[in-house]
Design a protein with these regions (language model features):
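Active-site regions of enzymes building and remodeling cell-envelope glycoconjugates
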Residues: 59-68, 134-139
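Short, surface-exposed acidic-centric catalytic microdomains
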Residues: 46-57, 71-74
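Short, well-structured N-terminal submotif of metal-dependent ribonuclease cores
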Residues: 1-41, 51-62, 146-158
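Active-site neighborhoods of divalent-metal-dependent phosphate/nucleic-acid chemistry enzymes
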Residues: 67-127
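Short, flexible helix/strand-to-coil boundary loops that buttress conserved ligand/catalytic motifs
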Residues: 16, 54, 81, 129-132
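Short, hydrophobic beta-strand segments that form beta-sheet elements in well-ordered domains
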Residues: 41-43, 50, 117-120
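Acidic, PIN/NYN-like endoribonuclease modules and their adjacent C-terminal/linker elements
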Residues: 2, 112-158
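Short, flexible loop segments at the rims of nucleotide/cofactor-binding pockets, characterized by
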Residues: 17-20, 45, 94-98
Length: 158
C-alpha cells in the first residue's frame, strides 16, 4: 500500500484547468489517490507558487495535507542544492533558479517519511531529480504527469 504523494504546482495548474492537455491525467491521478486512500500532500511552497496566478480557495484543500517548509527540509535543501550547483553545466536547464523551488520540494519529499512519490509535469524539474538520484539516495520516486495513472501503476482504466 502506498502511503503519500507530494503534488507540485504543475499538477494543480493542470488539474484545475479542464482545457489543459494534461487535465485528464491529473484528474485520473487525483481520483486514483482518493480511491486508494493515498495521502495527497502539498507544500506551502507550491501553494505560494499557485497563488501567483490563482487563489488558494481554488485548491482542493479538504483532500490535501499541507506540508510547511521546516528546518529539516532546509538542511536537506542545502545538500541537494550543492549537488545541483556542482553539476549545473551538465543539466542543460532552461533559465531557472535552482534553490528556490525544485530542491526545496525534493527535500520535503525526501524528509517526509510517508512520501513515496512526487508528481509533476515539469520536465526541467525531472532533470534535477535524475541528477540527485544519481548522486544521492532519494527515498521517493518522480512520477511524470504525462504518463497516465493506469500506466504508472499498472492498472486497468475501467
Amino acid at each position: 500500500m502506498h502511503e503519500a504523494v507530494l503534488l507540485d504546482t504543475s499538477f494543480f495548474l493542470r488539474f484545475l484547468n479542464d482545457s489543459d492537455p494534461l487535465f485528464n491525467n491529473a484528474d485520473g491521478y487525483f481520483r486514483y489517490f482518493l480511491q486508494r486512500e493515498i495521502t495527497m500532500m502539498v507544500s506551502t511552497i507550491s501553494i505560494a507558487e499557485y497563488c501567483v496566478g490563482g487563489d488558494v480557495a481554488e485548491l482542493p484543500l479538504k483532500n490535501l495535507q499541507i506540508v510547511p517548509f521546516n528546518l529539516d527540509h532546509s538542511k536537506r535543501t542545502g545538500e541537494f542544492a550543492k549537488i545541483v550547483f556542482q553539476n549545473k553545466g551538465k543539466l542543460k536547464l532552461r533559465e531557472r533558479n535552482i534553490i528556490p523551488n525544485d530542491t526545496k520540494l525534493f527535500a520535503q519529499a525526501d524528509c517526509e517519511k510517508a512520501v513515496e512519490f512526487y508528481l509533476s509535469s515539469d520536465k526541467e524539474s525531472e532533470k534535477i531529480y535524475n541528477l540527485l538520484k544519481r548522486q544521492t539516495a532519494l527515498k521517493f520516486q518522480f512520477m511524470d504527469l504525462n504518463i497516465p495513472y493506469n500506466e504508472m501503476f499498472g492498472v486497468l482504466d475501467l
